[in-house]
Amino acid sequence: MAEFPASLLILNGKSTDNLPLREAIMLLREEGMTIHVRVTWEKGDAARYVEEARKLGVATVIAGGGDGTINEVSTALIQCEGDDIPALGILPLGTANDFATSVGIPEALDKALKLAIAGNAIAIDMAQVNKQTCFINMATGGFGTRITTETPEKLKAALGGVSYIIHGLMRMDTLQPDRCEIRGENFHWQGDGLVIGIGNGRQAGGGQQLCPNALINDGLLQLRIFTGDEILPALVSTLKSDEDNPNIIEGASSWFDIQAPHEITFNLDGEPLSGQNFHIEILPAALRCRLPPDCPLLR
């Protein structure tokens, strides 16, 4: 086997008892690969481990977890200064794994790990909210955000992405749309949004294709709004094709400004952010990520 530079795996603490992962790491180590492993316990650990990775001189920092772990690691990487910043590798171990699934990361741990170490590093975009918080996949607001935020951890652990749908049906009678105004390049809309998706990536909420035209290296954010006054009719209408659906508003821009008369919540790769004003902008070619050669989210 060809020699590869060292990697550091930042593993979400919930995945420490994953026996197949342990076996995959040991096998690659036996084949001569150097893989350091660090486990996160609390917020901020990923940033410290990325700094350690730079001191070790590794070529890749692998995010082992779900969308939240990928977000935390990628955010730490784009905040690094200087040269020789490691590439991002992805090892999907979360509940939904929306970003990993949409970019074509293999489900098999051994194949995903090899790709994370030896795959081609491609420059991709990230997005930033209010000059502070970042996301690599998607910002979602409205009905979908409240569902993903409120779904019990035990339900997610047992059922995975399906848990979001089940919890949503249970809560349907209490959910209301978010009234807001959204501006972008050659875009303006004001009204009631049941679901709002602003995507660098394409899917969220356990496999829902909210922004099916998004690409991660085109310098643009894709916006999709599901409008309507009542939850159930609007959700049923999402089963129609886009051409026949009057409840879908779409736009594309390198930035979007969102204003609301009341506090609303956006879910940024699994992390909630509440407020009345949001400025969301793309950060072109913000980091390098090891992706499969047939990744569908590259232009």
Curated annotation (Swiss-Prot):
Query: What GO cellular component term, any one, is given?
Result: cytoplasm
What Enzyme Commission number(s) appear in the record? Answer: 2.7.1.-
Q: How is the cofactor bound?
A: Binds 1 Mg(2+) ion per subunit. Ca(2+) may be able to substitute.
Pfam families named among the record's database cross-references: DAGK_cat, YegS_C
Q: According to its UniProt record, which cofactors does this protein need?
A: Mg(2+); Ca(2+)
What are the binding positions for Mg(2+) in this chain?
L215, D218, L220
What does the UniProt entry say about where the protein is found? Cytoplasm
Q: Name one GO biological process term.
A: phospholipid biosynthetic process
Task: Specify the DAGKc domain's residue ranges.
Answer: 2-133
Matches recorded under InterPro entries:
ATP-NAD_kinase_N (IPR017438), Diacylglycerol/lipid_kinase (IPR005218), Diacylglycerol_kinase_cat_dom (IPR001206), Lip_kinase_YegS (IPR022433), Lipid_Phosphate_FormReg (IPR050187), NAD/diacylglycerol_kinase_sf (IPR016064), YegS/DAGK_C (IPR045540)
Q: Which residues form the active site?
A: E271
The entry's ATP-binding residues are T40, G66, D67, G68, T69, I70, N71, E72, T95
Which PROSITE patterns does this entry report, sorted A to Z? DAGK (PS50146)
| Record key words, sorted | ATP-binding, Cytoplasm, Kinase, Lipid biosynthesis, Lipid metabolism, Magnesium, Metal-binding, Nucleotide-binding, Phospholipid biosynthesis, Phospholipid metabolism, Transferase
Per the entry, what this protein does is: Probably phosphorylates lipids; the in vivo substrate is unknown.
**Homology family:** Belongs to the diacylglycerol/lipid kinase family. YegS lipid kinase subfamily.
Could you tell me what this protein is called? Probable lipid kinase YegS
